[in-house]
């Protein structure tokens, strides 16, 4: 009975965990790496076709996005997820496949002119459709049995519609162990969805640490803040453009705007129009409504019971076709435009930036995280111009942001989730956080809760029956390609040496408190190694 850590170790994206128990082999999540990639990930230790099943925490691409690639490599087994997660994956994986194929077509068209070899997409639409047929819909809070000796329960993680923490009971050799995967833990009091469920018992815990080193601070009154921005922008004759993630954040914005309109918070602009220009966002909004009775919180359900749709209001218009999208920019009235992608690196939002960035009457409002290197981050950091569709556009619009809005719990929320266990777990594995954040949060779990906590690197293996590490992997940093393959190889070898140095320091710290004679012998061994390799010829 063991767990092997594959992805989202000392990194935020690419979640994947491999488990062996009760004679079965299975995964928890199989996500896509997004943004900068700093560490090498261990390959799956078995062929995809040898896996028995997959458990999926939620639909975000960094947890589900590589499932079609798993199917393409031979996996034909079931994927267990909540009803809403299955519904969201149906649109998100198909959308991802479309992007993969479009990018491959574009790169190959360009590459043929330059004589480059054909670029193969990570997966195709056929792969996405194939894997979607294998999804198994599971209710919250009900134990299912994917295999003899393995029991599973999904509980609400409060992060996204359908998101879950997963409780797994494993029985082997008449011994039973419980491991809990936190998934992404949500904020309290988010619009629409319920708060995270706290779990009382676990032998082992694998938990995220996205914001394990920081607090979101006091939560602003978002409808009031948004109303003030709309008012100010409309009063000067401008448009409000909101780059927004299609799934989750767009629905939050609609929820806030419905409140603003209902309460009459924008004066002198009655009946203003709100465009949602993202086919994926429009499909996701429909899925939110279809899963209301299992996923909505009490406040949203009260609205529904009164016959009020929390995500709809007078003046809301959705665009599907590209002609619909283009027509928005010919509407001369003041308006709100919500479009993807949230970081402005793709999608229809780029067209709206082209038409609105240059005008000082307009406002570009960011409502989500902007990664380093993205156009959204550049705008927030004061870019004075932006290249869009081969044209340089001057930035004259007001650039603004709504602070603290996040689907992830901050460090206090994470500690409260971990504190809910009534007895201390045997071990807590901290993952899904930036390199230093995982270590910082693991240390806080030790100091504040007295937990045995570590932040494993990819490839680390842990025996769940014996409660011991079988193999402690070291982080192998990815070396950027250089002009010389020889230089790249040398850099990779040197990085491995540094990784072993980090491992040595870890072992030294673990030996604190050991008998003096053992420490003396350890020190002599290290001294001998240093004497052997201390180079005087360089």
Where are these regions (language model features)?
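Short secondary-structure boundary/capping segments
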Residues: 94-99, 103-107, 221-223, 256-261, ...
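C-terminal, active-site-flanking charged/polar segments
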Residues: 359, 434-479
